[in-house]
Amino acid sequence: MTMYIDNSKLKVHISLWLGSMFWLISIMIIVGGLTRLTDSGLSITKWQLFSGILPPLNENDWVQYFNLYKEIPEFKLQNYSMTMNEFKIIFWWEWIHRFLGRLIGLAYLIPLIYFSFKIKFKYLINLYLIFFLICFQG
């Protein structure tokens, strides 16, 4: 994607922004792969965009999350003998993966809003398309 922007300082800022997005997404791919390899993908059974950002903070929270996990088929059919400590390991992989997703969304959206006032509209279409694709990742 080539953008012709007059201000060289703005070009540097956009390059740094998109370069940092590249690295965040690269980290996300690695963490996502490790999440799959450890079968951690279903350890958090509810997707709570805002309230789910905090991990369990005490033993009672851990018990609640573990009890929710015990209700899904993955636990009943495959991990029925899993202990709390084993659950915590897979939980953390999934939590980091989801946290990175939120971080990537914000790290893209906030500069996008700022640059929306600095860049010509015809160049913004591609940047907003990328944001749309980020939002609809599964």
Residue ranges and their predicted role:
Residues 113-119:
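Structural signal for the C-terminal ends of transmembrane alpha-helices
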Residues 36-84:
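Histidine-/acidic- and/or cysteine-rich, low-complexity loops and terminal segments associated
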Residues 32, 93, 97, 137:
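Aromatic/pi-system hotspot detector in well-structured domains
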Residues 20-27, 31, 103-113, 129-136:
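Lipid-exposed faces of alpha-helical membrane segments in multi-pass integral membrane proteins
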Residues 14-18, 121-131:
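Membrane-interfacial loop-to-transmembrane alpha-helix junctions, especially the N-terminal start
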Residues 13-52:
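N-terminal signal-anchor transmembrane alpha helix
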